């Protein structure tokens, strides 16, 4: 799959980041992860991101990274495209991008570099080097210490033909408006804020109709129902789900730092697709929070 084909795929539909399965010792559980992907693939996501943020990319060793990507590619071959997370220091991101391409992934999501702040010139060089190291498509993840301004994005679209996507987690509506209006369809735009469904309507109005759904990990039927309602401007359905499910979900998520990932794994366990514990420095939900989440999920009915 070339970069343009990937761009077309991520320009429409719902995207999701499967959690990464660990056993009770905290080791990668390949068979459980493969079963998870087999369960999720038929629900209709346009692409799945292996080893993304929700997949605890930040905690994987080099060997585990390769095993996660290979398992995802092999399991989903012919059914749904796999986009790999890649990031950290520039040379590490290049190594991971090359490895993902070698293993048959269809592109990468370029995750933020680690810890240090960087100038726009430094970020441009970082993205350029990663893009130049591979042939397949690269999606830039605009978040945390890794945020590009409009001028930098323009320069990179001219330098890097295989830079095909821009995922925004900044929530800066004015900036996203400027980007979509100036860059146009040179890039595909993805909403990337936590619990993205709550922000999906305003992002759609900006020309960013696609987003990644974390809750697809445990309520794929409802996640697709929400996306299809959003797509058809069925505000009655989207408003009902936001009020009755997503806003209460956010209240649980915000009880502790790191719950944005821990809560997703807990949800998967509640619906019968246990992915094991999260790895430190994340912590699993408390029993009380787990029970509150289970009660909320139960209101949606079978998935």
Swiss-Prot record:
**InterPro entries cross-referenced by the UniProt entry:** Aldolase_TIM (IPR013785), DapA-like (IPR002220), Dehydro-deoxyglucarate_dehyd (IPR017655)
Q: Which GO terms describe its biological process?
A: D-glucarate catabolic process
Q: Which domain of life is it from?
A: Bacteria
GO MF annotation list = 4-hydroxy-tetrahydrodipicolinate synthase activity; 5-dehydro-4-deoxyglucarate dehydratase activity
Q: In which pathway does it act?
A: Carbohydrate acid metabolism; D-glucarate degradation; 2,5-dioxopentanoate from D-glucarate: step 2/2
Q: Which reaction does it catalyse?
A: 5-dehydro-4-deoxy-D-glucarate + H(+) = 2,5-dioxopentanoate + CO2 + H2O
Q: Which SUPFAM superfamilies match?
A: Aldolase
Q: What class of enzyme is it?
A: lyase
Q: Where are the transmembrane segments?
A: none
CDD domains cross-referenced by the UniProt entry: KDGDH (cd00951)
A Pfam family assignment: DHDPS
* Keywords linked to the UniProt accession: Lyase
- Gene3D superfamilies per the record? Aldolase class I (3.20.20.70)
Q: Does the keyword Isomerase apply?
A: no
Q: What is its EC number?
A: 4.2.1.41
- Which NCBIfam families is this protein grouped with? KdgD, PRK03620.1
Q: Which family does it belong to?
A: Belongs to the DapA family.
From the Swiss-Prot or TrEMBL record, give the protein name: Probable 5-dehydro-4-deoxyglucarate dehydratase
Which species is listed as the source? Acinetobacter baumannii (strain ATCC 17978 / DSM 105126 / CIP 53.77 / LMG 1025 / NCDC KC755 / 5377)
